[in-house]
Amino acid sequence: MASFVDRVIVHATGGNGGHGCVSVKREKFKPLGGPDGGNGGDGGSVILRVDGQSTTLLGFHHAPHQKAPNGEPGKGDMRHGFKGQDLVLSVPDGTVVKDREGNVLADLLGEGSEYVLAAGGQGGRGNAALASPKRKAPGFALLGTPGEEQEVELELKSIADIALVGFPSAGKSSLIAAMSAARPKIADYPFTTLVPNLGVVQAGDTRFTVADVPGLIPGASEGKGLGLEFLRHVERCAALVHVIDCATLEPGRDPLTDLDALEEELAHYAQDIADEDPSSIPLTQRPRLVVLNKVDVPEARELADFVRVELEQRGYPVFEISTASHEGLRELSFAMAALVSEARAQEEQREQQRQTVPVLQPEPVRRRRGRDRREFVITREDRAEEPLYHVRGEKPERWVLQTDFNNDEAVGYLADRFAKLGIEDELFRIGAKPGNAVLIGPEENGVVFDWEPTMVGGAELLGGPRGSDLRLEETSRPTRREKREQFYDRMDAKSEARAELEQERRAGVWTESVDARDRRRTSETKETNEK
């Protein structure tokens, strides 16, 4: 079972925002209490935070899917929903966050460094927050927006000052165990070290970290052995230490050929790093120390003395050591400390230069009055010989997600927001006509509707004045003139009905009773006498 993982794929999802509440205050002796729907809470975010106690990404290997809690919906009586708690994920120091295309999103260095991996959704506003002098009691609320979804690759690059590289069984693990309190696995067979080991070394007043990575062999850049998989852990090191086995009995191997093979494999890996990050110092240009190990063996000491001169002619500082007898370890530790101190001083100098360089402050952005067309972009596309107008922008897309399309009043409110933002004016300007299809948002999950300008549509959709709640509207009383017109209309309708019945009676369509005939004749006689 894996105990060390330095590269994982993580699927992070922020919590959804809670929906706003639609509520009207109900209280005795207050028939028009007004809206009191609360706002929904924001969804929780997924946050990566550097934890000094964390040393591996093993937890994400077992649980790659991480989702933050949702925000709670709003309630009546002005009760707002609780915000979803942020999901904080602990990662080791030196974790690099990349997207699926390999672009670096964040490089987390230092205790407490954070990166928001997936932001939570925004909570919807309740109808109390949407009330205005013109919209006193909204009958709708805004929905909460969904949280962000992101799939990233987490890659661990160990934070060490010195890196030990060499062939398998060269004594790298024995060296780090002899110089520090680290206790890596040590055995007499190749590839005993399968994961990087870190050890802290104290040399005088300098304290630094040494990293031991799995061994390299010729052809590692082509995938032989363990390949170059673990060399990412030496990218941050200030110096490299080549550990050469002088007691090996393998044919065709000697300290010089081993060193040349290591340099060749490092050059292949350095090219890959340069392609990803051109600003980093290549591995081939970093300081180096050559350690000739196992000189406690007589034949190994003779070989070390033989190749030492040529190595020094190449410009390498050479140290003859023995991890068994601890010979030469003190001199080696102080040489490492000198390289680390020099690298730290150079880093401090570069940091001071970055601070002293004047920073050009951009001109403050002043909010423009009126509409800003930069908040959205409209493009025309021809689909099946019909024009389609595609609207993209942070505000329009968020407003669509917040709209409950089952509520006509909410749809009217969305149309008002679009009109104030200037989308309708822009559609008119580029030649859109009523009835054309308009797509808001991305292709895969956008909203498509037939465009009808608000000047000709809106109130018809709501069945009443848009932006008001018909439940709280006072019934308007008809005027005296309207009552008179309604009375005359009813009298004319009755006269027309009586005339139609008389024509049917005379035509013999129906006959009247004796009592009805007597009443009719009496009425006619009375009308004649009055005339």
UniProtKB/Swiss-Prot annotation:
Keywords: Cytoplasm, GTP-binding, Hydrolase, Magnesium, Metal-binding, Nucleotide-binding. The keyword Hydrolase applies. It comes from the Bacteria. Mg(2+) binds at S173, T193. GO terms for biological process: ribosome biogenesis. Residues 2-159 form the Obg domain. GTP binds at residues 166-173, 191-195, 212-215, 293-296, 322-324. One of its GO terms (molecular function) is magnesium ion binding. It is found in: Cytoplasm. Its main location: cytoplasm. Residues 468-507, 514-531 have a biased composition (Basic and acidic residues). Pfam families: DUF1967, GTP1_OBG, MMR_HSR1. GO terms for cellular component: cytoplasm. Residues 368-453 form the OCT domain. Its EC number is 3.6.5.-. Residues 160-341 form the OBG-type G domain. Residues 346-365, 459-531 are annotated as: Disordered. Monomer. Belongs to the TRAFAC class OBG-HflX-like GTPase superfamily. OBG GTPase family. This is GTPase Obg.
